[in-house]
Amino acid sequence: DVKRLIDVIQKLRRNLSARAPVFNKALDDRVEKTRFIKPAGVIICEGWFWGAIPEPRSALINPANRLEEEQDHLGIWRSWVNDQIARYKEAFVSDISIYLRAPSLIASREWRKLQEEENLAKNGEDKSNIRLDIEKFLAHFERLVRWIDKELSGRANIEIVLDEYHDIARIEQR
């Protein structure tokens, strides 16, 4: 709900209180209750694709992986995703941006797998197919992850590079 996100952020920037949806990671969806947020001197927003900008159209021509090659050979899905990212532009306006950079796509996959295993364990669900499910899930976002890693790492005010154990390897300030 991009419009709602922008509304909440704008209210907080104007020093007004706002009601924001609550996201349940284990359910991968919002829950019915909302959270009351009071104005604060600093607003921190985070997310897997926070700060992303659309890729140039020319970059969308060739598939990024096997999933795109087999299921999006015409580029309809990747073009649609690119158009959706453009809708977030107003929400992503900030005074400072910090990019947490994973050491590799492989590390991101492993971290996501661990996160999903924890979520499944909380819900008492079977974890036997998690690796295959994660690989399939992440294939949908591989292009965007690679683009952000290339583009945002050069644009963020601060880049925090993590090692494979989630420790800070280095911090770069621009």
Roles of regions detected by a PLM:
Residues 39-40, 93:
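Alpha-helix C-terminal capping/helix-to-coil transition sites in glycosyltransferase folds
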Residues 40-42, 64:
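Glycine- and acidic-residue-rich phosphate-binding/metal-coordinating active-site segment common to enzymes
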Residues 49-174:
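Conserved NTP phosphate-binding and transfer environment spanning the P-loop NTPase/kinase superfamily
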